[in-house]
Amino acid sequence: MGVSAEPRSLSVARAGLASPVIEKARSALLPSQDVEDTVETLMLHPVIKAFLCGSISGTCSTLLFQPLDLLKTRLQTLQPSDVGPRRVGMLSVFLKVVRTESLLGLWKGMSPSIVRCVPGVGIYFGTLYSSKQYFLRGHPPTALESVILGMGSRSVAGVCMSPITVVKTRYESGAYSYESVYAALRSIYCSEGSRGLFRGLTATLLRDAPFSGLYLMFYSQTRATVLHGADELDAALMPLVNFSCGVFAGILASLVTQPADVIKTHMQLSTVKCQCIGQVATLILKTHGLRGFFHGSVPRALRRTLMAAMAWTVYEEMMAKMGLKS
C-alpha cells in the first residue's frame, strides 16, 4: 500500500502542474476560431458596412461613367494650337478618341480610377456615417451640418487618395505613358519627389470638399422635402426618389465647383515644381479667357451628377438592406 501511494501522489501533482500547460496549449490550438470571431465582429460593425456599401456603389458608378471623366480631362487640357479658330465640344473629342484610340480608349485610366474610387468612396461614406453617429446621435442634419459633414468626409478621402488621383489624371490626359499604377507612382516620386504625389491637392480639396458639402446639403434637404408627409410611399419608388434628388443636387454642386476642377487638372498635369493656384489660374485666364475655367463642364457635370446620384442610390439601398439608417 505504501509503495502504491507514492506514484498516485506524484500523478496528482503532475496533473495539477500539467493542467495550466494543457489549457494553454488548448487555447493556442484554437487561434483560428478566435480570428474568425474577431473578423466576423469587425465585419458586422456599422462603419465597416458603410465602407463596403460605399465601395460597391463607387465601383458601379466608376465603371459606367469613366468615359465622361476622360472627355472632361481632354477638353480641359486642349491647347489653342489644337483647337484653331473653331470651337471644340464634347462630341468632337469623343469622335477623335474613338477614331484614334478605339472605343476602349474611352476607358483609359480605368485602373487608377478603380484604385481611387473603390476605397475613396468607401472612406467617404464610412467617415460620413461615423461622423453622423458621433456628432448627430441619429438626428437628421441641418443644411449647415450637411455642408460641414460632407466637406470633412470628402477632405479625409481626398488626402488619402491624392497620389492615385494624380496618376489617374495623367493617364486620362494621354500625355503620359506608364506601365502600371505602381510604375506611375514610383516614376512620379523619383522625378518630382513626394510633393509630386500630392500635386494639385489644394485645388482638389477646393473642388471636392465644397462639392460634397453642397451636394450633401442639396441632397438631404431635397430628399427630406420630397419625403415629407409621404410615410406611405411605395418602397419600390425609393430608388427613383433618391436618384432624382441626387441628379438635382449634382447639377447645382457641379456648376459651383467647375473652375476649381480646371485648375486642379492643370496643376496635376504640370511637372513644374512650386506652381501655385494663383499662377495656374492666371495662365488659364491669359490662354483661354474666362471661358477656360468652364472647359469640360458638360461631361464633368454629367459624370459627377450621374456618379453621385447612382452612388447614393446604391448606398441607400444597401444600407437599408443591412438594417442601417444612412
Swiss-Prot record:
Residues spanning the membrane: 51-76, 109-135, 147-172, 200-223, 241-267, 296-314
Biological process annotations from GO: erythrocyte differentiation; glycine import into mitochondrion
Each Solcar repeat, start to end: 45-134, 141-225, 237-321
Gene3D superfamilies: Mitochondrial carrier domain
Gene Ontology MF terms in the entry: glycine transmembrane transporter activity
Alphabetized InterPro entries for the sequence: Hem25/SLC25A38, Mit_carrier, Mitochondrial_sb/sol_carrier, Mt_carrier_dom_sf
Annotated Pfam families: Mito_carr
One GO CC annotation: mitochondrion
Reaction equations catalysed: glycine(in) = glycine(out)
Keywords associated with the record: Membrane, Mitochondrion, Mitochondrion inner membrane, Repeat, Transmembrane, Transmembrane helix, Transport
Annotated localization: Mitochondrion inner membrane
Keyword Metal-binding: no
Membrane topology (UniProt): Multi-pass membrane protein
Protein role: Mitochondrial glycine transporter that imports glycine into the mitochondrial matrix. Plays an important role in providing glycine for the first enzymatic step in heme biosynthesis, the condensation of glycine with succinyl-CoA to produce 5-aminolevulinate (ALA) in the mitochondrial matrix. Required during erythropoiesis. Plays a role as pro-apoptotic protein that induces caspase-dependent apoptosis.
PANTHER family according to UniProt: MITOCHONDRIAL GLYCINE TRANSPORTER
Family: Belongs to the mitochondrial carrier (TC 2.A.29) family. SLC25A38 subfamily.
Protein name (Swiss-Prot/TrEMBL): Mitochondrial glycine transporter
